UniProtKB/Swiss-Prot annotation:
Keyword Kinase: no
InterPro entries: Ribosomal_uS8, Ribosomal_uS8_sf
Protein source organism: Carsonella ruddii (strain PV)
Top-level division of the source organism's lineage: Bacteria
Stated role: One of the primary rRNA binding proteins, it binds directly to 16S rRNA central domain where it helps coordinate assembly of the platform of the 30S subunit.
Any Pfam family hit: Ribosomal_S8
The name this protein goes by in its record: Small ribosomal subunit protein uS8
Amino acid sequence: MVMITLINNIIRLINSYNSGKNICICIYSKISMLLLGILIEKKIIKSFFVLLFKNKKKIFVIIKTIILIKLFSKPSNKRYIKNKYLKKIEFNNGLIISTNIGLLTIRECLKLKIGGKIFFSII
């Protein structure tokens, strides 16, 4: 269920950017907050804030730029990677991996020497 929420939020960000909007409303979850924190570090979004809207929490995201986001793992097709294969990946700057600690970039996974499920890449 968490995977569907994250994929839905990423697709919402891409669609709102492609339609020319700077603000996107996303579904609130703790892992979505981790994802948005990583996207701020990568300078893809400017900022985000949480508001209570009709007794439900929503995340309002201000988008800066989205170059290209490619989803690897889907609910029906999960792709895992071990620690020893992380160094062989060519586009190691924008790969986001879901681990037992949470969502991490590939550089953080190399420092901690852990693998996980490949979630998406930012190209």
